[in-house]
């Protein structure tokens, strides 16, 4: 209880800091299109180095958004809810204190899932941890997400150097509502110090180092103690050990280390930022707190490269961003022996080796052309290309799962002026996308091929990742100033998206979002 109380107090403190940053930055105001343009041009804010803030646009801004999201349809992964409803609030702000630059953000979301399956132990089964517990029963989940971030940086020291620090705290509380139930708490706390060097007005260099700690406490139980439940302890790609009862207690502990390098070339009408990063996460899972037994772990290595360019002319702005990510996860299993001697009571690790590998490559290209109008745009045309390749393997007995996809998206936005008084705007967005599956399969070579972890969980994931589908949607945003002499802009936004596919008896998925907010 004391530890949970301390975590709660830390959360409250960070909320106060984020809100303070937002309120102090309330001197400026932007329409939704102007806020979008401002964030797009702040290239260093999308990097992993807080020390780059002096090289971005340093005018103050803040926003607060209240939102409701609803997703419905069976085109989803087996662990996702066929229906998901989210209520959330977010706040973000940047302030120029002359002798320091400070940015803060806070996000809270309450997510209610309906008919989610094959997860009975962890808050996020897609975070790169293949070792968790699953069951067949579709269930409701009640999840809460807290995400707090801050960045602080010095102005240029000696006209060349700048120092910066980024911190973030993420907490997730998730509860499954049907036996076997789970109450799981996920936490991560990270710090990223950085430094930048300005060679001259055109060339800047940066370096940053990242560390974060990871913790998840998962406790399963049955409310109906008279009925034992079946569950499956997953080891990857359908391999599982079946259990019966009230489940297990799992303790996930991990650390992440990494670093990034940045190069920035800028001219009055052109800005380019190149960044390369590499990080390694090591995480293990233990069962039981009284006599901990190390079950498995992962070594997660991620390399990422991004190139962002923006060219601003008198009438038009060109924006391009391309990224490449290569992620490799080694799944490690442990063999332990119980030792009840007086000197060494508990489980003793005898051996460990890599039993599975998970490889993922993603590449993306985003291009946008916008027509300038003051600090916002009149219209914008967008092109998005995304490529993903997944190649997973359980080594012995051998099982494989792979998928390869290429998607193309087109979009257009028009920012209508409804009146110069009160800065009234109507922003309309229309977008379409098509995903072409280039191949994929799932071949299971282990024992118990009739387990639902094989026939329903992994096969369901393969079906999801090997679908051709198209997406069509759009949004409408109305905004205006509160008063003529105040630059606070209120806005209301409605988003609708529909994904359709005829593969594997899917009937698609619908997304509806409604939000209210204000920009300062």
What is each of the regions a protein language model found here?
Residues 74-80, 115-121, 174-182, 218-224, ...:
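Outer-membrane beta-barrel translocator domains and adjoining extracellular loop/strand segments
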Residues 239-383:
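Long, internal scaffold/assembly segments composed of regular secondary structure
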Residues 23-116:
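N-terminal, post-signal peptide beta-strand-biased segments of exported outer-membrane/organellar beta-barrel
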């Amino acid at each position: 209880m004391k530890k949970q109380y301390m975590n709660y107090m830390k959360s409250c403190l960070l909320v106060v800091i984020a809100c303070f940053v937002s309120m102090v930055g309330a001197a400026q105001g932007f329409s939704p299109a102007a806020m979008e343009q401002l964030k797009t041009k702040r290239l260093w804010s999308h990097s992993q180095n807080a020390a780059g803030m002096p090289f971005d646009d340093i005018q103050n801004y803040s926003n607060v958004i209240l939102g409701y999201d609803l997703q419905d349809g069976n085109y989803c992964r087996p662990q996702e809810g066929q229906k998901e409803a989210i209520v959330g609030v977010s706040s973000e702000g940047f302030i120029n204190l002359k002798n320091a630059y400070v940015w803060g953000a806070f996000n809270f979301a309450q997510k209610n899932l309906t008919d989610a399956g094959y997860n009975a132990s962890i808050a996020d089964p897609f975070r790169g941890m293949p070792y968790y517990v699953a069951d067949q029963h579709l269930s409701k989940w009640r999840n809460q997400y807290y995400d707090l971030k801050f960045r602080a940086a010095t102005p240029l020291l000696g006209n060349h150097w700048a120092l910066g620090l980024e911190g973030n705290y993420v907490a997730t509380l998730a509860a499954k509502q049907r036996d076997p139930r789970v109450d799981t708490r996920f936490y991560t706390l990270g710090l990223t110090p950085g430094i930048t060097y300005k060679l001259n007005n055109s060339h800047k260099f940066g370096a940053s180092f990242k560390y974060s700690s990871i913790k998840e406490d998962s406790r399963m139980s049955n409310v109906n103690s008279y009925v034992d439940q079946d569950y499956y302890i997953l080891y990857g790609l359908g391999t599982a050990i079946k259990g019966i009862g009230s489940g297990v207690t799992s303790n996930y502990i991990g650390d992440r280390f990494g670093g990034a390098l940045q190069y920035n070339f800028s001219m009055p009408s052109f800005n380019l930022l190149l960044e390369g990063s590499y990080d390694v996460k090591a995480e293990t899972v233990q069962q039981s707190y009284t006599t901990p037994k190390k079950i498995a772990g992962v070594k997660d290595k991620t390399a990422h490269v991004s190139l962002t360019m923006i060219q601003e002319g008198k009438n038009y702005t060109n924006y391009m961003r391309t990224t490449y990510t290569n992620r490799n996860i080694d799944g490690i299993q442990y063999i332990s022996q119980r030792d009840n001697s007086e000197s060494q009571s508990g489980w003793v690790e005898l051996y460990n080796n890599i039993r599975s590998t998970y490889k993922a490559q993603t590449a993306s290209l985003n291009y946008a052309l916008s027509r300038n109008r003051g600090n916002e745009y009149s219209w914008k045309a967008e092109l998005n290309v995304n490529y993903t390749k997944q190649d997973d393997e359980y080594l012995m007995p051998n099982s494989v799962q792979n998928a390869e996809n290429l998607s193309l998206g087109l979009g257009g936005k028009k920012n209508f002026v409804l009146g110069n008084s009160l800065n009234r705007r109507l922003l309309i967005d229309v977008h379409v996308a098509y995903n072409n599956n280039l191949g994929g399969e799932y071949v299971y070579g282990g024992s118990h091929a009739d387990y639902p972890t094989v026939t329903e969980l992994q096969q369901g994931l393969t079906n999801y990742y090997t679908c051709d589908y198209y997406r069509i949607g759009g949004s409408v945003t109305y905004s205006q100033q509160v008063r003529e002499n105040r630059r606070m802009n209120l806005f209301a936004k409605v988003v609708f998206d529909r994904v359709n596919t005829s593969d594997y008896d899917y009937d698609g998925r619908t997304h509806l979002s409604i939000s209210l907010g204000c920009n300062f």
